[in-house]
């Protein structure tokens, strides 16, 4: 059972359902851990997860996982679904008979948070379904201080779930036996039909929103009535007494036993920071980051075999003629050993990993074809519209390749893939944005889980984000993946942020992600115009040996006077202008990995270019964006010189809305860095 819930009742669930020792909870209240033993930053007790193997009445052992989550209500919903789907895929459980996602919601959040609808919409989609989710709504008839009339425009908080046409049960929260009956009915429905089911437990919050809150300020009449009501354990005890099921002495004995247990557990507490407990399938994965280069080349003979398999349409399959021609050109470049473009290198990286037994899951909006019509991982018959997936036809023994066009969602879809990555550390799990600009629709998932999950909860992830990035005159919402925001989230090695400039570098980067002994999220600024740029190609030899290089240096032919450091596609414009002007005094350095900052590589380079009088950082993003503010202090400390900024001036918008203005600004940047057009 994969369980997600907010903070209310969380400690109760941990100790009474997942059987977490009371003594561990007492230690969390005392905050008495040795600071020297603390790993990462930690989190408050109401956010931490837990998992255990619980033996139920019939002797069956059920693994129960309560996911760690942030205070942002409902944000954990798609994470639960993703982890559940990963476990189902690993267990060969497509109908969800062995793995059950269970979500506990609040009434105000279920009606109000948009991510709920995004998660519900995944329920029956091929790439996301988990055999149905059981939703339990703790309906306290209030959201902090907000009454239902101000919290939703529908009669019931559950009405958003009507989109799925599934059962919604409303049950009285003071009737435990009725609630149990409904839960059994809900689970039977889910098991038989493989769909979601919703249980609305109509109850109340006895105290305020938190330990120090006073509800009488805003709901005096409601809380007068609540405080007149006996607690539910008293009501249920009285019902059992009335039916002569138990005696008063037995009830008192139970109460005494609970209090004695709590006292004993409090006395026995030993507040030692708990050791990491990983989910299944994490054996052999290291937590420590290393900048040691990982050999990721693939022998030419094997790449040729793989290229023929992924670029050959089977007999009898009527593929679109333009696609057949495209695949033919891809194969031709591999056979010639030169001119391998971005999509071709990606396909070869995927094929090589799959043939080595490493599964791949690739999702995103329009990702099968690719936003820029570059990938074509799924071919569609012109006669029957049946699909053929070349990367699933590599031969016996290959790993599973899953490519799905996602629903039109960023936050929910990215949260799902983050959850999936928690359950499949040995695979390459990728989420691609349609344009990198749209990643801010999922900013909560990036901030709360991807960037900080390991620090807060010791939950590493190897998720890869592919974010098309680069100014090309397409306006402010089709230009920037907000590189600067990812860099602001970087603290040491929590995120790998890369901006590769060649297909070979991308090839090695993808392979490195699953070949290195640890797992860290990888954020890749991917290209748009470079997908078809005549200079953005690699040779077969570039793929057959070597590794991903965090820094690429291209020195001039003469004495170096100025060093231009940049990252991303602008390097090709700088190279072209340098050639046009025969500016042999310029050295060009490409920062392919921005974080963790490649200090060693740049130190060595600075030593070789010690004669340079000037070091410049060149970027096409505005001065308050891009990598400038992250790179400036680090680069200056290495070269022991002032680093000059060359780029657009600061701007509220990431790019101009008019193509002509873009061209004028871009030319000004290139001219300042290298010189005006000859």
Language-model region placement:
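Thiamine diphosphate
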Residues: 130-247, 459-460, 471-484, 516, ...
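Conserved internal helical-beta-strand scaffold that buttresses enzyme catalytic cores
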Residues: 1-115, 120-153, 159, 164-169, ...
């Amino acid at each position: 059972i994969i369980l997600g819930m907010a903070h209310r009742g969380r400690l109760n669930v941990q100790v009474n359902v997942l059987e977490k020792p009371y003594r561990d909870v007492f230690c969390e209240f005392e905050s008495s851990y040795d600071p020297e033993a603390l790993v990462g930053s930690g989190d408050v007790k109401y956010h931490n997860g837990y998992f255990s193997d619980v033996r139920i009445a019939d002797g069956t052992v059920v693994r129960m996982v309560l996911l760690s989550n942030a205070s942002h209500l409902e944000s954990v919903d798609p994470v639960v679904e993703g982890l559940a789907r990963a476990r189902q895929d690993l267990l060969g459980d497509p109908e969800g008979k062995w793995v059950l996602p269970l979500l506990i919601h609040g009434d105000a959040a279920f009606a109000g948070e948009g991510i709920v609808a995004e998660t519900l919409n995944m329920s029956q989609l091929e790439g996301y379904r988990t055999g149905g989710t059981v939703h339990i709504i703790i309906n306290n008839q209030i959201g902090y201080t907000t009454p239902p009339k101000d919290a939703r425009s529908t009669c019931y908080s559950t009405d958003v779930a009507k989109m799925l046409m599934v059962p919604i049960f409303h049950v009285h929260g003071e009737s435990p036996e009725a609630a149990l009956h409904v839960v059994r009915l809900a689970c039977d429905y889910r098991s038989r039909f493989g769909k979601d089911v919703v249980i609305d437990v109509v109850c109340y919050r006895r105290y305020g929103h938190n330990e120090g809150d006073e509800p009488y300020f805003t709901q005096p009449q409601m809380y007068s009535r609540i405080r007149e009501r006996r607690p539910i354990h008293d009501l249920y005890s009285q019902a059992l007494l009335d039916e002569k099921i138990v005696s008063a002495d037995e009830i008192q004995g139970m109460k005494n036993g609970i209090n004695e247990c709590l006292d004993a557990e409090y006395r026995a507490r030993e507040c030692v920071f708990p050791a990491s407990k990983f989910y299944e399938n994490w054996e052999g994965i290291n937590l420590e980051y290393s900048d040691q280069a990982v050999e990721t080349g693939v022998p030419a003979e094997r790449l040729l075999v793989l290229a023929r398999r992924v670029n050959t349409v089977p007999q009898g399959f009527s593929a679109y003629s333009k696609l057949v021609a495209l695949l033919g050109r891809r194969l031709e470049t591999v056979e010639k050993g030169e001119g391998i473009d971005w999509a071709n290198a990606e396909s070869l990286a995927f094929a090589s990993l799959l043939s080595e037994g490493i599964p791949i899951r690739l999702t995103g909006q329009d990702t099968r074809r690719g936003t820029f019509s570059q990938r074509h991982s799924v071919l569609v018959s012109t006669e029957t519209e049946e699909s053929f997936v070349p990367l699933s036809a590599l031969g016996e023994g290959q790993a599973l390749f899953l490519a799905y066009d996602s629903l039109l969602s960023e936050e929910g879809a990215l949260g799902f893939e983050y959850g999936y990555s928690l359950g499949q550390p040995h695979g390459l799990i990728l989420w691609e944005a349609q344009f990198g600009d749209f990643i801010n629709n999922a900013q909560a998932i990036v901030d709360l889980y991807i960037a900080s999950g390991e620090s807060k909860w010791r939950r590493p992830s190897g998720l890869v984000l592919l974010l098309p990035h680069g100014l090309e005159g397409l306006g402010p919402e089709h230009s920037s993946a907000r590189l600067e925001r990812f860099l602001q989230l970087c603290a040491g090695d929590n995120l790998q942020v890369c901006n590769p400039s060649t297909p070979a570098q991308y090839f090695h980067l993808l392979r490195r992600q699953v070949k290195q002994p640890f797992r860290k999220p990888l954020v890749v600024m991917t290209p748009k115009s470079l997908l078809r740029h005549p200079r953005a190609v690699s040779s077969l030899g570039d793929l057959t040996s070597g590794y991903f290089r965090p820094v690429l240096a291209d020195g001039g032919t003469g004495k170096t006077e100025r060093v231009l450091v940049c990252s991303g596609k602008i390097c090709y414009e700088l190279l072209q202008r340098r050639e046009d002007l025969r500016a042999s005094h310029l050295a060009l350095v490409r920062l392919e990995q921005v974080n963790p900052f490649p200090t060693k590589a740049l130190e060595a380079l600075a030593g070789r270019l010690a004669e340079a009088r000037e070091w410049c950082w060149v970027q096409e993003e505005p001065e308050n964006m891009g990598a400038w503010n992250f790179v400036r202090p680090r680069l200056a400390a290495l070269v022991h010189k002032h680093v000059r900024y060359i780029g657009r001036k600061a701007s509220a918008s990431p790019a101009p809305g008019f193509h002509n203005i873009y061209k004028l600004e871009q030319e000004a940047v290139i001219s300042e860095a290298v010189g005006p057009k000859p």
